């Protein structure tokens, strides 16, 4: 007996509906919302496909579209490629509902249809494009090269790539040769609350603005000297407090302001406080060992004048003396050969070779030193140099000018050390510039000319008190041919600072004076152009570094760099 499937199906549906507890009104509302959503989706898809068809015809007129669906191979023999102008023969409907794949002969046209009509894709692609925008390395390097120092230091914080690019030797060399650097004046050894603060104060001459550089390496260190060369500042010697005693230093610290980096080089052989220092470039043939050998040879010949020959001395010790002399000569020749090989290897790897000279100062027992040391950057070693001439006295100041290290003593004597040949020359000058001995004189080299600033009593008196009624600071120049001093100009300010410091930049003299009066520290920054006829001084900056400093005139020292 056959049973109808339809009644059984209706009966099962009715039973299922009876089991359900959901209300009919809820089911009806859900079904209506679902129908509206499906209808809206179909309308949007039809509009997008229609716009795509219009754009295809408008952009690529005559675009050939073929059906590459599943039935493509079966109808390949019957269907042929045709143009859009042949009443649509062989063309499939683009805006229809059939799901077929369309290939366009114009490369990328299909993607262009979809991208142009999809605003979200355009917005996302624009954001991705902006994310990947970058400058080539050569253009970025040229832009960084032209930044001032403060902006360049801020650029180091952008990313590691910018930091590494701005710290290379090639970048620094191109920045130096491109004349994009400006002069900076750095003030060291400023005191705060009676002790060394360790901070460095940098003055941007072009922007007339001071900057403070914090460092812990110089905190508590004082009575050191500084000199600058190759965009680096060298801090030489000094003292520090070690519990209940003072400690003298032999170490040398090197500060690179352009990258805010510190490093150390070889220490001196003797600890020195307040040494007279200087730095200058030398040729690749320069050798401290050669100059030392020349000095030893001269002393050997001088010591033999009026002496006895080896032949007339003890004959039994003649062979021993000859053997010791031959072994010493062989060892000296061998060591000299090894040093020359090391120099040649280092000269090929290094860019510019320079020497650092430190003379005088005080030792570990506060005794004045008449010795000196010279540092060779190629070998990173210090060597003893010839002592100061007999009776020269305590060195008060010094400067390097035209390859000669000039030193001036408290006894008003002048000597010069020939760096290439390695010996001192006593210089007799006349007349000696008058000075007040409570104020130290300062030697300055400016534009290959040698100057000295000293404080003396004014020559013009009122007849009542006499000539010692007013002290002035005068600028003197030494004629390097006739060895005579000539007065150049008079500083306009009263010499209140007994330790005023001066540096030079081409034809410009720069001076910093700091002194305490009525409980307040005053600071003055003055400059003088020596090429002008009057060589007059003018004030550049006043009272900008005196907020938290005191008694800074005791130990301050300055250095000038182009950064």
Curated annotation (Swiss-Prot):
Residues 129-175 form the F-box domain. The keyword Repeat applies. Kelch repeats lie at residues 184-231, 232-282, 355-402. InterPro entries: F-box-like_dom_sf, F-box_dom, Kelch-typ_b-propeller, Kelch_1. Keywords: Kelch repeat, Repeat. It comes from the Eukaryota. Pfam families: F-box (PF00646), Kelch_6 (PF13964). This is F-box/kelch-repeat protein At5g42360. It comes from Arabidopsis thaliana (Mouse-ear cress).
């Amino acid at each position: 007996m056959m049973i109808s499937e339809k009644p059984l199906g209706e009966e099962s549906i009715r039973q299922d509906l009876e089991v359900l507890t959901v209300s009919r009104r809820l089911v009806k509302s859900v079904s209506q919302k679902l129908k509206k959503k499906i209808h809206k989706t179909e309308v949007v898809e039809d509009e997008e496909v229609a716009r795509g068809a219009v754009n295809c015809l408008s952009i690529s007129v005559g675009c050939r579209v073929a059906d590459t669906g599943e039935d493509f191979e079966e109808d390949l023999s019957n269907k042929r490629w045709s143009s859009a102008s042949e009443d649509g023969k062989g063309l499939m409907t683009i805006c229809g509902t059939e799901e077929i794949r369309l290939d366009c002969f114009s490369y990328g046209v299909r993607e262009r249809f979809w991208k142009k009509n999809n605003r979200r894709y355009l917005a996302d692609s624009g954001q991705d494009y902006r994310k990947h925008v970058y400058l080539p390395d050569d253009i970025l390097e040229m832009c960084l090269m032209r930044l001032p120092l403060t902006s360049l230091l801020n650029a180091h914080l952008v990313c590691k790539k910018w930091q590494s690019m701005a710290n290379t030797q090639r970048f620094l060399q191109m920045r130096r040769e491109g004349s994009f650097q400006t002069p900076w004046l750095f003030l060291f050894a400023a005191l705060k609350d009676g002790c060394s603060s360790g901070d460095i104060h940098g003055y941007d001459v072009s922007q007339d603005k001071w900057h403070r550089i914090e460092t812990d390496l110089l905190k508590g260190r004082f009575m050191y000297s500084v000199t600058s060369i190759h965009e680096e500042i060298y801090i030489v010697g000094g003292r520090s407090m070690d519990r209940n005693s003072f400690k003298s230093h032999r170490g040398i610290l090197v500060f690179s302001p352009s990258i805010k980096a510190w490093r150390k080089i070889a220490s001196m052989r003797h600890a020195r406080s307040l040494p007279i220092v200087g730095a200058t470039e030398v040729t690749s043939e320069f050798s401290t060992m050669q100059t030392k050998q020349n000095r030893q040879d001269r002393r050997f010949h001088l010591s033999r004048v009026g002496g006895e020959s080896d032949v007339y001395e003890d004959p039994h010790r003649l062979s021993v003396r000859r053997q010791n002399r031959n072994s010493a000569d062989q060892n000296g020749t061998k060591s000299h050969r090894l040093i020359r090989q090391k120099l040649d290897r280092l000269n090929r790897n290094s860019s510019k070779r320079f020497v650092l000279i430190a003379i005088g100062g005080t030792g570990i027992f506060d005794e004045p030193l008449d010795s000196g040391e010279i540092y060779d950057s190629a070998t990173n070693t210090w060597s003893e140099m010839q002592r100061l001439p007999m009776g020269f006295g305590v060195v008060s100041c010094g400067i390097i000018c035209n390859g000669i290290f000039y030193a001036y003593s408290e006894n008003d004597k002048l000597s010069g050390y020939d760096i290439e040949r390695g010996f001192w020359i006593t210089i007799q000058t006349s007349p000696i510039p008058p000075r007040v001995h409570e104020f130290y004189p300062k030697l300055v080299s400016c534009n290959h000319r040698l100057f000295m600033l000293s404080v003396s009593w004014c020559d013009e008196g009122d007849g009542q008190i006499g000539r010692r009624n007013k002290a002035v600071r005068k600028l003197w120049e030494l004629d390097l041919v006739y060895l005579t001093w000539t007065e150049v100009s008079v500083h306009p300010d009263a010499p209140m600072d007994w330790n005023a410091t001066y540096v030079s930049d081409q034809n410009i003299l720069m001076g910093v004076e700091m002194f305490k009066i009525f409980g307040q520290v005053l600071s003055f920054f003055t400059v003088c152009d020596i090429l002008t006829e009057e060589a007059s001084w003018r004030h550049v900056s006043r009272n900008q570094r005196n907020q938290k400093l005191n008694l800074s005139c005791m130990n301050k020292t300055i250095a000038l760099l182009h950064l």
